Amino acid sequence: MAKIKSIKGRQVFDSRGNPTVEAEVFLENNISATAISPSGASTGAFEAHELRDQDKNKFLGKSVNIAVENINNKISDKLKGLESDNQKKIDKALLDLDGSENKTNLGANATLAVSLANSKCSALSNKKPLFKYLGNTFSLPIPLMNIINGLSLIHISEPTRPLD
């Protein structure tokens, strides 16, 4: 059970050459992991808010320096010292810190990158691949049904004779 030592955010570029957020989480046991927040080509009205700087002089307004500052200051300070294995607590702390319905204050790009980097750190700390680490969290319900019945309820009688 390693605790979060620090979190570092930075601006990187996605596959389309647009700025996006990368977060790196460092644990007290010297394990670290990074995650990059993806950004879609189109956004819907009810999606979480992707925080962009809107400064037309920097990458046509698409830079994410404010979201990176949120990671390096607000988010890092809030999550430092928390157990990285408690993903639910980490995510709740991120939601509480943001305080908005659609992550307008910190930016969904910042919170997602931090959350994913933390889960990758926890998986590494537990010496498991991420899919196995997360796979232990969820399980599918096992359907219970009766496919083959016994014959105890069937009454077998003599066949009836045809009427003459």
Model-assigned labels for residue ranges:
Residues 1-19:
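Short, Gly/Pro- and small/polar-rich lid/capping loops
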Residues 21-25:
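Short beta-strand scaffold segments in enzyme catalytic cores
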Residues 38-128:
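Metal- or metallocofactor-binding catalytic centers and their adjacent structured scaffolds
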Residues 32-36:
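Well-ordered beta-strand positions in beta-sheet-rich domains
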Residues 123, 127-144:
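Glycine/threonine-rich beta-strand-loop-alpha-helix active-site module
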Residues 13-15, 19, 99-118, 143-153:
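Glycine/serine-rich anion-binding loops at beta->alpha junctions
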Residues 154-164:
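Single conserved hydrophobic/aromatic residue that forms the stacking wall/gate
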Residues 26-31:
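Short acidic-glycine loop/turn motifs at beta-strand connectors
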